């Protein structure tokens, strides 16, 4: 019997297994940030251990950084302590750090692929749940806890049980205006926010193959919102073209050798998955969440469902609670829901193609009165590229704030956060209660949908937008 891509990656990284025990896997890349690493480095120090493979360990500052200045004091005492601690730990243990003043600083799941640290066939871990992003390259990538961060720092290995496998097939091609964010929200809406629990999900099908690497990263980024351990997409020519020439990618003769191997990284024709789910791309409309988990999502032209229509009592109770928190009523159309804030950014949607999509909507328009809208590029290189293309001017002329790289309003760990009762159209990945600030109400959308909400002052169907007239 053939193997799935996940099974190939898992088996290739087993360094030790004993009957009845969890296999030990080798970890190729370890990504580190300021929030989940301090105790791990303290553990090394207490045991007088070193970092086993510092050349395969990379650190950045992203969660706590200010997006308005590079002042390490800007986001408060805890943020300052965590960032200064990361700097000291990286100096002591010989780990490469992309600090506040490094031109490549940015969100960890943006800079890894951007710098070519993320490679097909590799295992990648980080003390962050959205490490699944890197699976877009055919890498086995998943988030780990702080004790596991310490273990990988010390040994470059990790014990991991085998996961079940799920194949998600997106047949056909998406209509104009439908993005990877819409695809993955539709998948989560179909399966539920726990529908992937215990699985590694492989995305495939014509609609997935048609996506750019940036779109594929969005898909895999939100696999965790299905409850999945990781997301995967088999590498192909699109993958290789993206990686070629990046700083940490193979060079010269090693490049062709690597590509030859990477071409083998796909599920065999006779591989069996534990579950297969198929969606039709042409059935997917622009998506917007209405509740407090990513599975509570609908098409923009669909009214909010009544909890009474849900057969599962747990889902029904969750919907009642979500509607109360979000201050919404069943039957309401999202296009009738006004917003206060717009956030375009996060490890889900802060790459150059995301900013281009939002700028295409913002060009020649203005942010609606009473709406605060911000655009936060995912890294220094993304910011520089956007400015070279004039996207920053499009945004600022439309009334958006153009910020510095960081995790920003994805989570309430820095100065960018919602006030109680504020409603936000957000390109991030989680709409949990209080995720963007205590009492804040988060609606997940694509970059184009977020920009449309900003200029309309309410949610709008991006398919109805036309390019403004130009002289």
Curated annotation (Swiss-Prot):
Pfam families: Aconitase. Its EC number is 4.2.1.33. [4Fe-4S] cluster binds at residues 347, 407, 410. Binds 1 [4Fe-4S] cluster per subunit. GO terms for biological process: L-leucine biosynthetic process. InterPro entries: 3-IsopropMal_deHydase_lsu, Acnase/IPM_dHydase_lsu_aba_1/3, Acoase/IPM_deHydtase_lsu_aba, Aconitase_4Fe-4S_BS, Aconitase_4Fe-4S_dom, IPM_dehydratase_rel_enz, IPMI_cat. Keywords: 4Fe-4S, Amino-acid biosynthesis, Branched-chain amino acid biosynthesis, Iron, Iron-sulfur, Leucine biosynthesis, Lyase, Metal-binding. It catalyses: (2R,3S)-3-isopropylmalate = (2S)-2-isopropylmalate. Pathway: Amino-acid biosynthesis; L-leucine biosynthesis; L-leucine from 3-methyl-2-oxobutanoate: step 2/4. GO terms for molecular function: 3-isopropylmalate dehydratase activity; 4 iron, 4 sulfur cluster binding; metal ion binding. Its cofactor is [4Fe-4S] cluster. Belongs to the aconitase/IPM isomerase family. LeuC type 1 subfamily. NCBIfam families: leuC, PRK05478.1, PRK12466.1. HAMAP family: LeuC_type1. Heterodimer of LeuC and LeuD. Catalyzes the isomerization between 2-isopropylmalate and 3-isopropylmalate, via the formation of 2-isopropylmaleate. This is 3-isopropylmalate dehydratase large subunit. The lineage of its organism: Bacteria, Pseudomonadati, Pseudomonadota, Gammaproteobacteria, Enterobacterales. The gene is leuC.
């Amino acid at each position: 019997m053939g193997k799935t891509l996940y099974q190939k990656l898992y088996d290739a990284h087993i360094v030790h297994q004993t009957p009845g025990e969890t296999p030990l896997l080798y970890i190729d890349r370890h990504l580190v940030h300021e929030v989940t690493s301090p105790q791990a480095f303290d553990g090394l120090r207490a045991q007088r251990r070193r970092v086993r493979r510092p050349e395969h360990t990379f650190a950045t500052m992203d969660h706590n950084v200010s997006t308005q200045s590079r002042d390490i004091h800007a986001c408060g005492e805890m943020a300052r302590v965590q960032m200064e601690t990361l700097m000291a730990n990286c100096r002591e243990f010989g780990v490469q750090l992309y600090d506040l003043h490094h031109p490549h600083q940015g969100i960890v799941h943006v800079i890894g692929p951007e710098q070519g640290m993320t490679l097909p066939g590799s295992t990648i871990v980080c003390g962050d749940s959205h490490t699944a992003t890197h699976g877009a390259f055919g890498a086995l990538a998943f988030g780990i806890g702080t004790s596991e961060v310490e273990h990988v720092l010390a040994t470059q290995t990790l014990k991991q049980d085998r996961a079940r496998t799920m194949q998600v097939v997106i047949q056909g091609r998406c209509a104009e205006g439908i993005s990877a964010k819409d695809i993955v929200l539709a998948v989560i809406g179909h399966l539920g926010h726990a529908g992937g629990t215990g699985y590694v999900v492989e995305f495939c099908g014509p609609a997935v193959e048609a996506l750019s690497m940036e779109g594929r990263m969005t898909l895999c980024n939100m696999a965790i919102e299905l409850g999945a351990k990781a997301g995967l997409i088999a590498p192909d020519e699109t993958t290789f073209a993206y990686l070629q020439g990046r700083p940490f990618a193979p060079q010269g003769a090693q490049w062709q050798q690597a590509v030859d191997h990477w071409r083998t990284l796909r599920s065999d024709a006779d591989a069996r998955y534990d579950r297969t789910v198929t969606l039709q791309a042409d059935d997917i409309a622009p998506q917007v969440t209405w509740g407090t988990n990513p599975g509570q999502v609908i098409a923009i032209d669909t009214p909010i469902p009544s909890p009474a229509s849900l057969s599962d009592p747990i889902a029904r109770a969750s919907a009642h609670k979500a509607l109360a928190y979000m201050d919404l009523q069943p039957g309401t159309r999202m296009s009738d829901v006004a917003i206060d804030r717009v956030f375009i950014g996060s490890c889900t949607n802060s790459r150059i193609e995301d900013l281009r999509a939002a700028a295409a909507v913002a060009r020649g328009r203005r942010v609606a009165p009473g709406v605060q809208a911000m655009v936060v590029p995912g890294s220094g290189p993304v910011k520089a590229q956007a400015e070279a293309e004039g996207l920053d001017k499009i945004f600022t002329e439309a009334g958006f704030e153009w910020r510095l790289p960081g995790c920003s309003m994805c989570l309430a760990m820095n100065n960018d956060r919602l006030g109680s009762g504020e409603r936000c159209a957000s390109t991030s990945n989680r709409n949990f209660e209080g995720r963007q600030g205590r009492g804040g109400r988060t609606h997940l959308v694509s970059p184009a949908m977020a920009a449309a909400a900003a200029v309309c002052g309410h949610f709008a169907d991006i398919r109805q937008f036309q390019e403004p007239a130009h002289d």
